[in-house]
Amino acid sequence: MAVWDRIKDQAKTLQQSQGGRGANGGRSGGARAGGGSRAQLVSALKTQLGSLKTELKSGAYRDASMAMCALVAAADGHVDPAERQHVESMIVSNDVLQNFPPEQLRQRFNKHVDQLTHNFQLGKTEAMQEIAKTAKKPTEARAVIQTGIVIAGADGDFSQAEQMIIREACAALGLSPAEFQL
């Protein structure tokens, strides 16, 4: 648990250096209002995940992460071929996910995307069940959420739909969305 405590301290320091979450005054706009801090959060989470690379080698983490990535990609209800290919390339180039053979990652990601495209609610239920399998290992559970945030924020657009999906995944894992500034 010492590693996770260090990560939480780093995140807290990052949040304090940003002056808290309400630094945008009375402006509204959801994720847009905190665009700069979101980018910093994504960068910090990516670094934190990298520091856990040696611990994140289980099949449960791999499968849950691919389910999370598929949910993020399909958060708006559809995944066009260009988006699918873009997310797939981010997955296989992700430092932590390089613990796994790229073909395993592609296969699991595409299976979930296909299910979500065919029947979103059923696919979502199956993906959430896959994610929930990591709930008993807090480091892996948090890493799944962090992976989702990193993938969602990679294009600079962390949409409300993506945030909602990640909040639901937090609930499936028994984690507070506030822990991830959601």
State where each predicted segment sits.
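Small-residue-enriched hydrophobic alpha-helices in membranes
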Residues: M1-L71, P81-L182
